[in-house]
């Protein structure tokens, strides 16, 4: 193994592997370091139009055509059918009530479908991470990246020369690596966050949730269940199973992401912070020492219990995985040449499927910094912008996600909260589509939009106000997709920009 590289990347997930491949294509020496090996179980699986636009951009700009192929359902299926994924036409939401089958008195009363693509050919995807991550890692290694799997980082030192020395423990003993740059792509492991000079900002986050998740075989079709319950599916813009499917429950929600290998990712996320009035229903905050269950406690929700009845857990092998509080936030700049990808610096929440896009945007930005910034002044400015963009994006998404949770008990308010997120996402998509190079995702660099979002979220968290008018009128400058239109009955077919 070479013990000197230009860039050491900690974490061999999809983002680290894509970054490594692009850096090697530019002529740099790169090592990928990870304490585990492929294949491995992972979540963070739902892509979005914004993520796929950035993926195509990375593929074109860095001569990595396989990334372009993975950016739509049809090209993925035609070029890499052996890698499992799921077709994602959009986002679907259904509000459930305890001890009742799902029902609506009128279309959209307790359901919302938001299309993210015009048809199946250009649909987004759910990533079966076990296979996707392994594929992207092998592509990077085939291009010349130094492979260091099974290496646990135990020490990082910055030398007087400005370079770094990384020491890791592996089966063969202790390994030493010297590098000019460090990029932490370790995701929720967040190796750099444990360093004494890391700046922990978790206390600034509003969102407080935990999650329990696993992969199941033989999960029933929600679309078929809706048919059995007498719902007219012809009015839907897409099959609700071809979606990031959100089932809203008391104090949280359940996700279902269906892959084309018979496996469904199922996860339950629960709000564990204070309710809008400072209390939960029984006056106490949830006891997070008691794990959530999957799927045994779905008996309270009979529609879900029926589609989960035939299901069996396939991964992780030790049983469903549960977290404590999910949220963490660390400033992503440890030093001028020691940086963290967004998904290593923050874990927020799966609600709006922001993780893949945020990770890929970070890859795109770091490639620009590492490859093109030659002098110290340019580098200082670019690194400062990198941190500023990340923190402003994180603040906005935290505001939107926490507000969505606090309004889940009122489906109209929850839907309105989601519309703010969709407006920001669509604005970003349109900017990428126009060939722009935005410094932020989700329109977080538009001061007027951010101020509107804060006002709207404040209104949504209050019990007595005309939030519908506040949001409908305030959203107008950015509402290119007809959001908040009561005539469509929560069925949005034309939000896609592909």
Where do the language-model regions lie?
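Beta1/beta-strand and adjacent pyrophosphate-binding region of the FAD-binding site
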Residues: 2-13, 31
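N-terminal Rossmann-fold NAD(P) dinucleotide-binding loop
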Residues: 16-17
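Glycine-rich FAD pyrophosphate-binding loop
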Residues: 24-45
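N-terminal FAD cofactor-binding segment of flavoenzymes
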Residues: 40-102
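Short beta-strand to alpha-helix junction loop
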Residues: 117-139
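Predominantly flavin-linked oxidoreductase catalytic cores and closely associated redox partners
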Residues: 135-303, 363
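FAD/FMN-dependent oxidoreductases across multiple families
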Residues: 250-254, 258-260, 272-401
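C-terminal helical "tail/cap" subdomain of flavin- and related membrane-associated enzymes
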Residues: 369-498
């Amino acid at each position: 193994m070479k013990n000197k590289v230009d860039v050491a990347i900690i974490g061999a997930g999809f983002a680290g592997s894509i970054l490594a491949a692009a850096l090697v294509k530019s002529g740099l020496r790169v090592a990928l370091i990870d304490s585990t090996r492929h294949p491995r179980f992972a979540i963070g699986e739902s892509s979005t139009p914004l993520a796929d636009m950035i993926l195509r951009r990375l593929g074109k700009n860095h001569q990595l055509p396989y990334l372009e192929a993975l950016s739509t359902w049809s090209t993925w299926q035609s070029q890499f059918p052996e890698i499992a994924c799921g077709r994602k036409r959009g986002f679907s939401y259904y509000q459930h009530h305890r001890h009742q089958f799902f029902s609506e008195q009128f279309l959209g009363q307790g359901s919302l479908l938001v299309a993210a693509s015009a048809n199946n050919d250009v649909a987004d995807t759910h990533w079966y991470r076990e296979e996707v991550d392994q594929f992207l890692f092998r592509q990077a290694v085939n291009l010349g990246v130094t492979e260091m799997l099974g290496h646990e980082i135990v020490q990082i030192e910055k030398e007087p020369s400005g370079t770094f020395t990384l020491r890791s423990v592996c089966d063969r003993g202790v390994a030493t690596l010297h590098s000019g740059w460090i990029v932490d792509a370790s995701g929720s492991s967040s190796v750099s966050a444990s360093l004494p000079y890391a700046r922990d900002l978790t206390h600034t986050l509003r969102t407080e949730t935990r999650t329990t998740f696993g992969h199941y075989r033989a999960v029933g079709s929600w679309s078929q269940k809706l048919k059995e319950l007498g719902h007219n599916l012809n009015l839907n813009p897409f099959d609700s199973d071809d979606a990031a499917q959100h089932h809203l429950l008391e104090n949280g929600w359940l996700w279902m992401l269906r892959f084309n290998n018979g496996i469904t990712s199922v996860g339950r996320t629960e709000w564990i912070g204070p309710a809008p009035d400072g209390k939960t229903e029984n006056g106490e905050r949830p006891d997070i020492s008691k794990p959530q269950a999957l799927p045994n406690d779905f008996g309270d929700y009979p529609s879900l219990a029926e589609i989960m009845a035939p299901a069996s857990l396939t991964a992780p092998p030790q049983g469903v995985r549960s977290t404590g509080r999910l949220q963490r936030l660390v400033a992503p700049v440890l030093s001028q040449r020691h940086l963290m990808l967004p998904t290593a610096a923050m874990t927020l929440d799966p609600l709006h499927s922001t993780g893949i896009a945020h990770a890929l945007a970070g890859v795109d930005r770091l490639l620009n910094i590492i490859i093109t910034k030659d002098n110290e002044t340019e580098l200082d400015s670019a690194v400062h912008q990198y941190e500023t963009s990340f923190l402003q994006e994180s603040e906005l998404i935290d505001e939107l996600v926490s507000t969505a949770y606090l309004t889940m008990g009122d489906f109209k308010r929850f839907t309105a909260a989601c519309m703010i997120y969709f407006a920001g996402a669509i604005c970003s998509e349109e900017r990428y589509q126009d060939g722009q190079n935005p410094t932020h995702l989700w329109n977080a660099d538009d001061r007027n939009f951010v101020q509107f979002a804060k006002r709207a979220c404040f209104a949504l968290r209050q019990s007595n106000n005309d939030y519908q008018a506040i949001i409908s009128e305030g959203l107008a400058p950015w509402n290119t997709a007809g959001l908040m239109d009561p005539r469509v009955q929560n069925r949005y077919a034309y939000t896609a920009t592909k």
